[in-house]
Structure formats: C-alpha cells, structure tokens
C-alpha cells in the first residue's frame, strides 16, 4: 500500500540559503628544505605524526569533533538539512518494509523539526547483552552508538533504502536537544538527549533473563498506555556546529521529500 508523507511548517520559514563564499589559497613559491629529518624531535615538531597523534573518541565525540565527515558541509545548509533526511530515511524504511503508511515532517517556530511515523517503533526494551553499566534500552543504544541499528542482522529489514550514513545517532550528536518518543506494544516511552547525552537517566535493578542475576538497567521513561504506534523524533540543531545557514528551508525540504515520496 502507498504511504503518505506530509511536510508542514509552523509558520512557513523563508529560505535563507545563500551560496558559500569561495576562498582561494595561494601556494608558496617554494617549500622549505629540511636537511636532516632525524634532527627534528617529534615533540618539537608541531606537524609530527606519531603514537601521540592517535586519538580514541568515545560514543558520539567523533561526530561532534568532525561533523563534516558524517553529514557534509556545515556552512552551506546541506549538512543542516541532511539531519532531517537521516531521520526521514528511517521512517521510509519502515514504509518500504510494509509497516508504516504515514510520515509527517514539521518545521516548528523555534527551528526544531519533528518526524513522526506510524511504523513499528524503535525497540524500547532493555538490551540485556549490552556491555554498558547500567544496561540501556535498545532505543538509547541506537541513538548514542554510531554503528548500532536494526539493519545489520538481515532480519529487521528485508527491504531497505540502505544504511543512510550513520543514521539518527548522528542527528542526536549534532542537536542541542533531541526528544524521542516510541509508541510500541501499547506503551509510550520517552528519552531526552542534549548534545548526544541522555538526560534524567532512570536507573533501577531488574533480574537479567539471560543470567538470573540482578543488574542495573536504564529503561526509557514510561509515559503511559497508547493505542498508537510508531516513532517520533523531535530535535533542535546545535548552532555551535552549523555556521552560516542555520534556518531550515521549507522549499528545500519540500523538494527533497516530494522526490522521496515517489520512490
């Protein structure tokens, strides 16, 4: 069955897109000559590449440190709008798999964007094989780990539009705040993040069904019963990341989403 994809703005936001300025860099006439490389001590050479140059970035640190590697240009607006496409791609995959018929994208007056679908909802139960302490919900892992999701095991999605870069975890990392609401199995559950970090974490002890031992777990906040299903992602881009173009363009999103609705 065909699915419906809506785009709306509150109110309509003007397109502030502008072309990025071109910058020319003059090459030096001649490169400096080094007589003996052995004479340069690594600690005294600012361009030295050695073991101290290798950094280990945990979680979503890498995305915030080098956002352009994950979403493209953060100055010309393409990276900003790519955040929306990453979230929408997940909803479209639910539609391609036959589980969603409706996707709604809203630009809010504060320049935040929400994407709501009526798919199965991101799994919200505790992932008992999680190595983290406390053990986290599957939804939290999907939003805070770069290479986590439901498209790696060949079971969750028999049909998929692809992995779509690094998905919603990248959006989470580059947002001032992100609010996730999952409606699944008759319950609505909620998580809030700021710059990729979960807020107001709930920690309790439950018996691990795999081992029988009591373990610390961090479930999503229970909002209550619901007869709806699906995933809602509402986020506000972090303007310390995005430089010149900081407002979403209704026309840019409309054009892209109109194309996607026919694919």
Where do the PLM segments sit?
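Conserved ATP-binding N-box helix of the HATPase_c
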Residues: 77-101, 167-174
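Structural recognition of short helix-loop-helix hairpins that underlie histone-fold modules
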Residues: 67-75, 151-152
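A conserved short beta-strand within the histidine kinase catalytic ATPase domain
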Residues: 101-107
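Short, Lys/Arg-enriched N-terminal segments with co-localized hydrophobic residues
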Residues: 1-16
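N-terminal amphipathic, basic-rich helices that act as targeting or association modules
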Residues: 50-64, 75-86
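Mobile ATP-lid/nucleotide-binding loop of the nucleotide-binding subdomain
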Residues: 145-146
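Short basic (Lys/Arg) and small-residue
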Residues: 142
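GHKL-type ATPase core
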Residues: 16-53, 111-138, 149-263
């Amino acid at each position: 069955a065909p699915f419906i994809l809506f785009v709306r703005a509150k109110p309509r936001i003007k397109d502030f897109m502008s072309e990025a300025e071109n910058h020319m860099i003059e090459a030096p006439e001649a490169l400096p000559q080094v007589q003996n490389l052995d004479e340069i001590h690594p600690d005294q050479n600012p361009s030295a590449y050695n073991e101290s140059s290798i950094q280990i970035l945990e979680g979503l640190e890498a995305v915030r440190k080098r956002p352009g590697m994950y979403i493209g240009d953060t100055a010309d607006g393409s990276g900003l709008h790519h955040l929306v496409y990453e979230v929408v791609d997940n909803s479209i995959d639910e539609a391609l798999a036959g589980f969603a018929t409706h996707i709604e994208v809203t630009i809010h007056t504060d320049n935040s964007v929400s994407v709501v679908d009526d798919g199965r909802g991101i799994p919200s139960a505790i992932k008992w094989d999680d190595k983290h302490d406390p053990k986290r919900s599957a939804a939290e892992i999907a939003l805070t780990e770069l290479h986590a999701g439901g498209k790696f095991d060949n079971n969750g999605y028999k049909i998929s539009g692809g992995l779509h870069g690094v998905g919603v975890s990248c959006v989470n990392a580059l947002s001032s705040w992100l609010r996730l609401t999952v409606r699944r199995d008759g319950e609505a559950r909620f998580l809030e993040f700021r710059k990729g970090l979960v807020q107001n974490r709930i920690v309790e002890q439950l018996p691990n069904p795999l081992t029988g031992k009591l373990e610390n777990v961090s479930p999503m906040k229970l909002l209550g019963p619901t007869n709806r299903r699906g995933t809602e992602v509402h986020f506000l881009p972090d303007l310390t990341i995005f430089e010149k173009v900081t407002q979403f363009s209704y026309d840019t999103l409309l054009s892209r989403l109109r194309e996607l609705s026919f694919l």
